From Swiss-Prot:
Major subcellular location class: secreted
Assigned keywords, A-Z: Glycoprotein, Secreted, Signal
Homology family: Belongs to the Dictyostelium gerABC family.
Segment forming the signal sequence: 1-26
The keyword Nucleus is assigned to this record: no
Glycosylation sites: N55, N119
Species the sequence originates in: Dictyostelium discoideum (Social amoeba)
Entry GO terms, CC: extracellular region
Protein name per UniProt: Spore germination protein 1/2/3-related protein
Localization, UniProt: Secreted
Amino acid sequence: MNIRNTLVLLVSTVLVLMSCSIGCYAGSPNCVGAPSGQVYIFSSWDFQGDRYVYNISQGQTTLPDSFIHNVQSFTSGSEICFASCNPLETYQISAGQSHRNYAALENFGQRMNLIIPGNCSNLVCPSN
């Protein structure tokens, strides 16, 4: 193989490899997007750290201890409701919605402890 053919092969290989990696980078919600019927909740910003997978078939669910008042980022594949019952506070989340830093400043990720499928009107707060 001559030098010209070697260079053409090398450049072609590099271009193919680059085209495979364009459009999706670590932490992109497009790369970690939850499929329909699921929500991915992360313990760190930018869709990093531990991940909790919620399926809408679970119904109203209290988050695992490590995620209560600690939802740092999320991506939703379904319409769901994030909630806190004491004091009562709810946020409706649409399918396809995501947030890279949900617990920053006054964001609700620092206060939520429940997740509900569908509309927030379905919330039933547990009695204390």
